[in-house]
């Protein structure tokens, strides 16, 4: 199976191939599978960008999308994730896109199901397609990753985006810095160095902001939104510290006036909405890879038709 579970399981050449494929889709080259293919999106956590961009990518590729709503499914009757995926496999689904609150939920599935699994986010663990779209956005801007300084600011401990990006950016030759409240530092993330926020922003080629993951916190945040913004947010004053040519990224949803001043969301250095656009092309590339690796009765479906 051509699963996409974490980027750490892909070689750098595989990652670059996905980015190249995404650029091909961005440039307007249409594709569709040689035979009908079916995909289901299983989102057990709320999502706007990831879910909608996967659905857009699936339709652009001519895939048949099977509706699935956990709140109206047998999950409410106690059905396990494994049995849900096996059910979809049994009725003919070829790939599943899954977002789940449990870290590494896919370990119970990867060797036990006959469909391609695409991880759309697992708890605090990984978010591979978000990292890919971030990489594509950075590459479009700078042409390379080697030697860049990427600063990730905010709720590092609870962020799957921070974990995924720090690992892959380090492998690609970037220098990763972290900044944020000390109580939200992630001792398990060894792919970056913690620095004070003003220093981080002044050194950055890429300023990547993270929202506060309230839903993953055992205790309520000790700061008000206004206090957080002043101490750890990208304020209008801090933005003046950015180098010429530095860019702002955010995986969204954006909490304006908390992690970033509202005026900066669509300011000249911001690539936040470009990230969202790139998400469709990246997910098209990921879905294409998943379907190409799909085993059907011992036959790997690899042939895709180019639509002239």
Swiss-Prot record:
InterPro entries: Asp/Orn_carbamoyltranf_P-bd, Asp/Orn_carbamoylTrfase, Asp/Orn_carbamoylTrfase_sf, Asp_carbamoyltransf, Asp_carbamoyltransf_Asp/Orn-bd. Keywords: Pyrimidine biosynthesis, Transferase. L-aspartate binds at residues 77, 160, 211. It catalyses: carbamoyl phosphate + L-aspartate = N-carbamoyl-L-aspartate + phosphate + H(+). Carbamoyl phosphate binds at residues 49-50, 99, 127, 130, 252-253. Pathway: Pyrimidine metabolism; UMP biosynthesis via de novo pathway; (S)-dihydroorotate from bicarbonate: step 2/3. One of its GO terms (molecular function) is aspartate carbamoyltransferase activity. GO terms for cellular component: cytosol. GO terms for biological process: 'de novo' pyrimidine nucleobase biosynthetic process; 'de novo' UMP biosynthetic process; amino acid metabolic process. The keyword Manganese does not apply. It comes from the Bacteria. The keyword Disulfide bond does not apply. Its EC number is 2.1.3.2. Catalyzes the condensation of carbamoyl phosphate and aspartate to form carbamoyl aspartate and inorganic phosphate, the committed step in the de novo pyrimidine nucleotide biosynthesis pathway. PANTHER family: ASPARTATE CARBAMOYLTRANSFERASE, ORNITHINE CARBAMOYLTRANSFERASE, MITOCHONDRIAL. Belongs to the aspartate/ornithine carbamoyltransferase superfamily. ATCase family. Heterododecamer (2C3:3R2) of six catalytic PyrB chains organized as two trimers (C3), and six regulatory PyrI chains organized as three dimers (R2). This is Aspartate carbamoyltransferase catalytic subunit.
